[in-house]
Amino acid sequence: GSCCSLRCKVDIILKNTLNMKQITLHVYQSIDGCPVPSDKHFDAAVDASGCVLIDEETYLRIYLNHLGWPITAKETLVVTNGCIDLTENERVKFIQKDAVAELKRMKEDGDGTVVAYGEEIGALLLDNGLADEITVTTVPVLVGGGEKALECGLHDGGAWIVRSNKVQVDGKMRTVYGKV
């Protein structure tokens, strides 16, 4: 009867959750919360992921810093308002219309992991409840200025828990937060 149908509904919910892509937002910040460059841990996360999700500003910064596109083994998704394709021969896809709906579709389309990086993409993911995990790496420096490494406009009401917290050999603090 009703117990079996409840169990079936729970199983379906769990299967749907397990078959969704997991989006992990990587944030690199100074002690005072300002953005700092990513490190080898981020490179390893990119290598282990199914694809990379970034914003337009991050795309341009990566392209200009490397004088080309360094992420060739993975598909990179760039959320943008305009057409800024500097990498037409690489595995880069631009999301220009209704990014939230497109990201929700992508998230529901199978399993795997997506690594996200960039201040604007972080705000988009957090404001729309799309991030499953946040990995914050705090570098022991003071940068100063008004720019923050992680900004979001809306509070989604969801709770986050610390999954791990570790001091790295180089003095950086890496904290992984997960949704409750």
Predicted segments with their positions:
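Intrinsic disorder/low-complexity segments
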Residues: 1-2, 13
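Cysteine-centered motifs
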Residues: 3-4, 8
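Enzymes that bind and transform nitrogen-containing heteroaromatic metabolites
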Residues: 14-180
